[in-house]
Amino acid sequence: MEIIIAFFLYLNDKRKKRFLFKKSKIPLMIITNNDIVMCPIWYNYQVNTVFLPCAHVACYLCSKIIKNCHLCRRKILKTQFFKLP
């Protein structure tokens, strides 16, 4: 059984217009029952926090420590907790 989790980003007006034309570009994370997605920073904990506006993920502990995204280096404006089944 596959579970699809879509992260909807807060987008500024310019990005919203681009987004409407490219609906197929919604960032998706496809997770199967056998997958365990580990934190890309520590590799000790399962991911459960998404950074906004970039939508990259990490574990809760890492999300509390870092101010800029570890992948794209964008400033983290907000974090959103999520729970994988």
Curated annotation (Swiss-Prot):
GO MF terms listed in the record are: zinc ion binding
Please give the positions of the paired cysteines in each disulfide bond: none
InterPro entries tied to this protein? Znf_RING/FYVE/PHD (IPR013083)
Q: Is Zinc a UniProt keyword of this protein? A: yes
Q: Which UniProt keywords apply?
A: Metal-binding, Zinc, Zinc-finger
Superkingdom as given in the UniProt entry: Viruses
Give the matching Pfam families.
zf-C3HC4_3
Say yes or no: keyword Ligase present.
no
The UniProt transmembrane annotation reads none
Zn-finger (RING-type) residues: 39-73
Name of the molecule in the record = Putative RING finger protein 095L
* Native organism: Invertebrate iridescent virus 6 (IIV-6)
